Amino acid sequence: MLDFEKPLFEIRNKIESLKESQDKNDVDLQEEIDMLEASLERETKKIYTNLKPWDRVQIARLQERPTTLDYIPYIFDSFMELHGDRNFRDDPAMIGGIGFLNGRAVTVIGQQRGKDTKDNIYRNFGMAHPEGYRKALRLMKQAEKFNRPIFTFIDTKGAYPGKAAEERGQSESIATNLIEMASLKVPVIAIVIGEGGSGGALGIGIANKVLMLENSTYSVISPEGAAALLWKDSNLAKIAAETMKITAHDIKQLGIIDDVISEPLGGAHKDVEQQALAIKSAFVAQLDSLESLSRDEIANDRFEKFRNIGSYIE
């Protein structure tokens, strides 16, 4: 339960208590239950239509929030995962492969968090090593060769900052991806589905179209990190989240992303299938908007997008 959801938790407890009493004592409490359920719906709408930036940060970090592998079966047909960077090893924090979107072969790449403690250790909490970014680039170059559109799912706190990752060239692997992605001659469409953290997000985020789920975040540093750097106090993360403009609607207003995809009431985890279908619809629409461009025009469109990205507000 998140802090701002406490009023909802209390109403749900009352509903469960009344239902239990109704079953145990064979009394009719349905009218009271109906009133509380109506109150719960009203309060849920009120809370989720007035979320603060820090509230959205908490939602983006939820353990139960859908991951790349949760969405893929609903969006793409016959997905086949491909492994390895052909240099060092496979990185489970970065998944990729080939699937079909409405009958068309596409390449799918995404950061992958774990679903529980054991899985998170295996997936390194969604923080990819250099071999993860090199695997992603290998699949992107393969997609370019076979003229397959590329779809990427961004969901990471950042690239892994450990000693071994640095020794194997973490910064070089991300920098190379930025250079190579800028000139790919096939459509690239990216979506931030959770946290989009720093260079770790950009390593698969240089796209013709960049989308965000409405409760996702996109930033150069975490609010806690920014607060520690700016004010020497990580406890001021809530203020930092508001100052940094890291939420989807703020970033859309700044011209950094192309579209915001709505989430089910309560967040994407409340209805994964509904959320996935909304993403699929956006993917199809964005891909259609690029169909008239030649291969050279697609690369130039992406290059110019990032040359002119963002805005300055005094």
Curated annotation (Swiss-Prot):
Keywords attached to this entry: ATP-binding, Cytoplasm, Fatty acid biosynthesis, Fatty acid metabolism, Lipid biosynthesis, Lipid metabolism, Nucleotide-binding, Transferase
Gene Ontology biological process terms in this record: fatty acid biosynthetic process; malonyl-CoA biosynthetic process
Annotated catalysed reactions: N(6)-carboxybiotinyl-L-lysyl-[protein] + acetyl-CoA = N(6)-biotinyl-L-lysyl-[protein] + malonyl-CoA
Localization (cell): Cytoplasm
Pathway in which this enzyme or protein is active: Lipid metabolism; malonyl-CoA biosynthesis; malonyl-CoA from acetyl-CoA: step 1/1
GO cellular component: acetyl-CoA carboxylase complex
GO molecular function terms listed in the Swiss-Prot or TrEMBL record: acetyl-CoA carboxylase activity; ATP binding; carboxyl- or carbamoyltransferase activity
E.C. code: 2.1.3.15
Pfam families per record: ACCA (PF03255)
InterPro entries found in the cross-reference section: Acetyl_CoA_COase_a_su, ClpP/crotonase-like_dom_sf, COA_CT_C
Domain CoA carboxyltransferase C-terminal: 32-289
Assembly and oligomerization: Acetyl-CoA carboxylase is a heterohexamer composed of biotin carboxyl carrier protein (AccB), biotin carboxylase (AccC) and two subunits each of ACCase subunit alpha (AccA) and ACCase subunit beta (AccD).
Xref: HAMAP family: AcetylCoA_CT_alpha
Family of the protein in this entry: Belongs to the AccA family.
Role played: Component of the acetyl coenzyme A carboxylase (ACC) complex. First, biotin carboxylase catalyzes the carboxylation of biotin on its carrier protein (BCCP) and then the CO(2) group is transferred by the carboxyltransferase to acetyl-CoA to form malonyl-CoA.
Name under which the protein is recorded: Acetyl-coenzyme A carboxylase carboxyl transferase subunit alpha
Gene that specifies this protein: accA
